[in-house]
Every structure is written in structure tokens, then in C-alpha cells.
Amino acid sequence: MKLKTGVMAAALMAVACGVQAQVVVKHLQPNEKSPIANGVWAGDTLYLSGQLASPVTPADEAKGTAAVYGDTKTQALSALNKIQALLKEQGLDMKDVVKMTVFLAGDPEKGGKLDFPGLQAAYTQFFGTKDQPNKPARSAFQVAALAAPWALIEIEVIAVRGK
């Protein structure tokens, strides 16, 4: 009886302490020269790095001016399209986004104030629509500046692969 009780107690302790599952971590590299991963998988959760806009006309990229990238709405649409493409490469879609963080720089054309309506106009084309009704938890902040001097917006997301 004592042996049975001891074995049972040991088994219960093992279950109570839990067996830690191995979480597979995979880094998505944009290219060999970039010091930043496009994203990181941790189990079924994908953490995408912040995305900036692409130039409206790629041939103008070397100019590096805000006009080449557009206003907040244009930049937000560009960043969201990049996010959508990155998610698609990983077998996900915008419906899988559970958290979004948006960093907005003040728009010089708006007296240094952030263009929240511009963000919303782009955001509502991807979330809360008839075709894609899901909406992630979201935070949006005005920051003093972003890494690229022309950037008005940077968006990062967390997405989860459903079972």
C-alpha cells in the first residue's frame, strides 16, 4: 500500500509540476544583410516586425522624401499591404491578427499632429469589413520620430495560427 501511495504521489507531482512543452522558434529573415528579422514564430504565434511604407513610385525611392511615400493614409495602406503579404507567405491572413501596435509620427502637413483619421481610413479597409469582420486589439501612439525621416507610420502585428 505504501509503495502504491508513493508511486501515485510521484505521478501527481509530475503532473502538477507540468511537463514543459518545447516551443519551436523560427526567425524570418528579410535578407542576409538586415540586422532585424521580418518576424519570429514562437509556437503558433507570429510576431511581425514593424513595417514602413514602400514608395508610391518605386523609381523615386532614392529621393527619400515624404512626398515619395505619401500621406498617413497612403503609408498605412502600404504598410498594411506589406503585412498582409508577409502573413500570406506564412499561411496566415489579416483575420489571424490578434494585436496591432501603430506608431505615428506627426505629419508636417498637419502642423506636426498625427493623422488619426488617415490611419483609420486605411485600417478599416482590412479590419471590420464584410469580408473580414475580425478586429485585433490595437494601440496607437504618436512618437517624436520614426527611424526613416520620411516615415509617418510604422505598424507591427502579432498573429496566431488557429487550430
Give, region by region, the residue ranges found by the protein language model:
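N-terminal presequence-like segments and the immediate start of the first folded domain
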Residues: 3-81, 85-98, 104-163
